[in-house]
Amino acid sequence: MVAGDQNADPVDGDSRPGAINQLLDNRRVNTSRTPTSAGGPEASRLQGQANESHRSPARYDTADFGDAIGSSGNMRGHVLPSRNLRIEDSGIFWPRQADPLSRLTGVYPFPSSDHRLVWVDVTLPHRR
């Protein structure tokens, strides 16, 4: 399992070209499910600007950075299980503004962080 804030959007990022793809494309990594949120698309629509030029869907965004035209992508955090782990569920904790829990993520200036929690539930393989 690889988890953390890699600050590497595979489509709209400004990190070293192809760096995160080396991990995402590795045969030992289970990428069968990409976590999503309801709040990412809402924030993208409300903020516009750079979000309008991003090629990856906003439902995959894991951070809410500055939206100046030309700024890099918002898929920054990753949770990547090993291929031998079955993904049961996944998501990004980024509720819509109407959700009472949105007070935990909020809008700028954020009450917590500009990064959102990425989570994956997996089933461990049976040990022999």
Spell out what each predicted region is.
Residues 1, 6-128:
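Metal-dependent phosphoester-hydrolase catalytic domains
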